[in-house]
Regions:
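4′-phosphopantetheine-dependent carrier domains
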Residues: 1-200
Length: 200
């Protein structure tokens, strides 16, 4: 399923459609990702509660741990290998070209992992929000990275734009005016809120 289809009241059970083997694997992946033996209470907790449990169990967690690092490495190789683009190139484009903070890097990487998956979501629609085909050169890679930045901005509720050449440092961004409250959604991964394993 897609990140925007996961709600704050979801649990590991609803995320795995009640299939015990998948739920158990998800719980093991969470523990492995966080680098802890187990996460007490994770099986029954809603995602809102799970975020609190995770912060307590692994207060020093920083993206990414063992599970997501491996998944990310494999996906980036598939997407960018032909163009010779490494993870550092993506980081540099986010921080140097877009002039966004380090926190955006993890969010963009997670978006490239989760939003380029092929197939249908178990909750309807396609898994992918971004192109799923491998890029062949640096300009194509830049276009895909930039699209991921825009997806992250949408999830964060801000507008961003590439700084003009020679312009002021920092991507141009603003918080759009609020009208009606939008439904709460699971946030893009941050150091305090690790993303769900890609198997979700």
């Amino acid at each position: 399923m897609r990140l925007d289809q996961i709600g704050s009241n979801d649990t590991t059970d609803t995320l795995t459609n009640g299939v015990s083997s998948r739920r158990n694997q998800l719980l093991m992946d969470i523990s492995s990702e966080l680098g802890v033996a187990s996460v007490d209470g994770a099986a029954e907790a809603t995602l809102d509660k799970l975020a609190q449990i995770v912060n307590k169990a692994a207060p020093n967690y920083k993206p990414f741990g063992a599970v997501l690092s491996e998944a990310l490495r494999d996906r980036l190789r598939s997407l960018f290998g032909a163009a010779g683009v490494k993870q550092q190139y993506i980081r540099d484009r986010v921080t140097n070209v877009w002039q966004l903070g380090e926190g955006w890097v993890a969010s963009v990487l997670a978006t490239l992992l989760l939003d380029t998956r092929e197939g249908a979501s178990s909750r309807g629609g396609d898994l992918a929000k971004l192109p799923t085909a491998a890029v062949q050169n640096k300009p194509e890679a830049d276009k895909l990275i930039d699209a991921a930045v825009e997806v992250v901005a949408q999830l964060k509720g801000v507008a961003v734009a590439l700084p003009s050449a020679g312009g002021a440092a920092g991507a141009l961004w603003s918080i759009p005016p609020r009208s009606t409250p939008s439904p709460r959604r699971s946030p893009v991964p941050t150091a305090c809120s690790p993303p769900p394993p890609a198997s979700c």
